[in-house]
Amino acid sequence: MKFKDWCVLKTKLSGICGSDHKQIFLDGNRDNPMTALISWPQVLGHEVVGYLEKGKSKSNLKVGDRIVLNPWISCLSRQINPPCIACQSGKNTLCRNFNKGTLTPGIHTGNSSDVTGGFAEYLPAHESMTIPIPDDITWEQALLSDPFSVAFHSILKVPVKPGSICAVYGCGNLGLLTILILKKVFDDVQVIAISRFSHQAAMAKKFGADLVINSSPTNRVIEEIADHVNCDIFSLKRKRPWLIEGVDYLFDTVASPETLEIGIRIVKARKKDTETNSLLSGVIVVTGVSSPKRYEWTPWYFKEISIIGSNAFAIEEFEDHREHAYFHYFRFLEEGRLNPTPIITHKFPLEEYKKAFLTARAQKKYKSIKVIFSFNDN
């Protein structure tokens, strides 16, 4: 261990995140500005559960305890004192010091050369990054703490309430978890899922989506939403239609030029609550990342739509609890309100990493959603 207050974790399970997938297959742009905040060489894998193998912890954890990793390497783990304004408020995913302190640049485990990831038998973790797994929560449930919290954080960006109509674009890991949370944690929310593949559509229905629409053809997506919410549709002959009414909120877990263009066409024009000044409609929350291209954005200004970025998770306030998103998740599990583990469709030993990544990539062929690595306890 290079620095004080660091531990060694022995990996039990690690999940393939969409960001891992994009990096392995070079699915992105070389000029992505995030490259200024990462360093090489890298060992990927930031969705990790395992055992505390070595190291002392101020949180009274002991060797052999089950741990879920909080992968963000911000001020505390970088030995920066005083911490930045974001870390002081519990929003360490917005840390101002990802390229400073005692560690090489990196925003989270797996993209710093000092903080290697969970696609390995062992990995380092600052004690602040180690969260104990409650006894009644399974390894698989705990492994989904990170993607669940990403979805939960995105929903809390808008004031979802009874009667809200929400669309979720994309039914991969984040999209399906967003659907599950909206239907199982919130009351009386209508959810429209837009999926690419039939096995994703089936899981969206299993998780409670009120309407599931195939993402192609795109004009049909708009038409089906107009039918569902019973609103007027506007179009010129042979041109892509759009709506002034539509859904209140869209959670875009793909964030491609096409999904953003469809999004600004299906989201209802802006409406504000006169008492709280919160936006009751006209908001797109973006959690996905795709390469930029041109798209037609006229409805964006016309309907005064707000497009909000949502980055990972933080200390969240919900149902009179203010705590890290992982602990909200644990509470929902313990109360029996939901179980997201059906999204885990494939499990591989690390030695079969090529097969695992190809399975994650060929979603239609293998009917894959969440692909994970499993390590022996011995």
Per-range role (PLM):
Residues 128, 134-224:
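Mid-domain Rossmann-like dinucleotide-binding core that forms the NAD(H)/NADP(H) cofactor-binding site
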Residues 238, 261-264, 271-275, 323-378:
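C-terminal hydrophobic helical "lid"/dimerization subdomain
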Residues 226-240, 244, 291-345, 354-355:
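C-terminal substrate-binding/catalytic core of Rossmann-like NAD(P)-dependent dehydrogenases/reductases
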Residues 35-37, 46, 75-169:
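NAD(P)H dinucleotide-binding glycine-rich loop of Rossmann-like/cofactor-binding domains
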Residues 2-14, 29-88, 132-136:
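Glycine-rich beta-strand-centered segment in the early N-terminal region that forms part
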Residues 195-196, 288, 311:
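Conserved acidic E/D residue at the C-terminus of a beta-strand in Rossmann-like folds
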